Amino acid sequence: MRIVVLGKELEYDFFDADLLEKYEKENLRVKERIQEPTQYDGKTTADSLRIQCGIVNDFFDEVFGKGMSEELFGGKNNIKDHMEAFAAVADAAMNCNGELTALTEKYSPNRAERRQAEKQNSKNFNRNAAYHGN
């Protein structure tokens, strides 16, 4: 899937189990690290933003490959850019999750059984209609 992040087009396959696992692991890691309160003790707001930007940098380097954060952010610690970039990837993952759910429902055994039953009922209806002169 193509994801546009800060004007740069990235590619990631959320349907590949190994890549999805890496994304999910790093996404959870971002959440845990950002919510760790002790790292902000005694820090200025600017230092806190640098910490958060560093966490997002680590995410991009782990998920998309070493150096991706530098490519995207150019060494800057702009929290707005970092959060928008992270959100773009999260949105893409959620869209793929919706597609995956639709795919699994479409091809689930229960649905296949229902379709077969509907098909059989349709055949029976058509036979009955022909027999009764309808």
Regions found by a protein language model. Give the residues of each.
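Short, surface-exposed loop/turn segments at secondary-structure junctions
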Residues: 38-47, 71-79
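Short amphipathic alpha-helical coiled-coil/interface segments
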Residues: 52-57
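Short N-terminal mixed-charge amphipathic segments
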Residues: 1-46
